[in-house]
């Protein structure tokens, strides 16, 4: 059985894939990106080539190169590098899984295939099992995101007996708002040392109460420090302070969601906050508008995300 060097927990940044204005991958800034996550945001785990990283818009060759660059630049700086290897083609997923093992990644994750879909738990398990077997020494994580895949198999059902079929299974990236399903995943697997990683950033505090051991998300690229403060407050059982942090984070997310928020806008915000050029997304996504970026910048400033000083006073009205 594959065991991680240590349990994947805490914040995991779903990394963006930087691109040039011509739509080519800009590998030159990934080293700077690593340093920014570690030093400025306090985030030392990453999830590469997922939704935020436009993994399914990249060629297999590009996905391999991106994975290699993150592993290389993250050596001795990052704690864990998880590579998403999901694809519509089983063979491509297996190739990417094997490659992740060869380059020294710390784990692999896979979404359900979403064009010709698996409609039952057993069919999905059979697909995941074949991918996991291509990297038998790596911890395996299932990436549950039914809103995008259209695969509605409940995670609770999937986890029932999963170690019998996939002995390298180590956890779940749960990117759904169904807290009943998530809670039952935790409750029914208390004897296992699974990593339960929540993937809806604006609801993280609720998931922590339900037993989440960590979180994977796009906002941890630029709100990692703030979210870590929420985690610290929660761990210290200062639930009022933790709630204040969550509400403040929600204010920003709620604001940008109303403007239209996705991968393109995440790239624009990350460029704004970090100073590292993330570039445009790849087609069919469109570059975020100047109006969006200006509005997001104004909201960040109004929320005083640089200090959070008023949160300790429980001031939930500031910056609204």
Curated annotation (Swiss-Prot):
What tissues contain this protein? Isoform 2 is expressed in placenta, liver, kidney, pancreas, spleen, thymus, ovary, small intestine and peripheral blood leukocyte.
User: What biological-process terms (Gene Ontology) are attached?
Assistant: carbohydrate metabolic process; N-acetylneuraminate catabolic process
**Pathway it belongs to?**
Amino-sugar metabolism; N-acetylneuraminate degradation
Pfam entry (one): DHDPS
Top enzyme class of this protein? lyase
What EC number(s) does this enzyme carry? 4.1.3.3
Q: Output one GO MF annotation.
A: identical protein binding
Q: Which residues carry out catalysis?
A: 143 (proton donor), 173 (schiff-base intermediate with substrate)
Q: Which residues bind aceneuramate?
A: 51-52, 175, 199, 201-202, 218
Q: Name one GO cellular component term.
A: cytosol
Q: Which reaction does it catalyse?
A: aceneuramate = aldehydo-N-acetyl-D-mannosamine + pyruvate
Q: Which UniProt keywords apply?
A: Carbohydrate metabolism, Cytoplasm, Lyase, Schiff base
Localization recorded for this chain is: Cytoplasm
InterPro entries, per database record: Aldolase_TIM (IPR013785), DapA-like (IPR002220), NanA (IPR005264)
Q: Which CDD domains match?
A: NAL (cd00954)
- The main place the protein resides is cytoplasm
Q: Does the keyword Cytoplasm apply?
A: yes
UniProt key word Chloroplast: no
Q: Assembly state and interactors?
A: Homotetramer.
Family to which the UniProt record says this protein belongs = Belongs to the DapA family. NanA subfamily.
Summarize the protein's role.
Catalyzes the cleavage of N-acetylneuraminic acid (sialic acid) to form pyruvate and N-acetylmannosamine via a Schiff base intermediate. It prevents sialic acids from being recycled and returning to the cell surface. Involved in the N-glycolylneuraminic acid (Neu5Gc) degradation pathway. Although human is not able to catalyze formation of Neu5Gc due to the inactive CMAHP enzyme, Neu5Gc is present in food and must be degraded.
* Name of the molecule in the record: N-acetylneuraminate lyase
From the UniProt record, report the name of the gene that encodes this protein: NPL
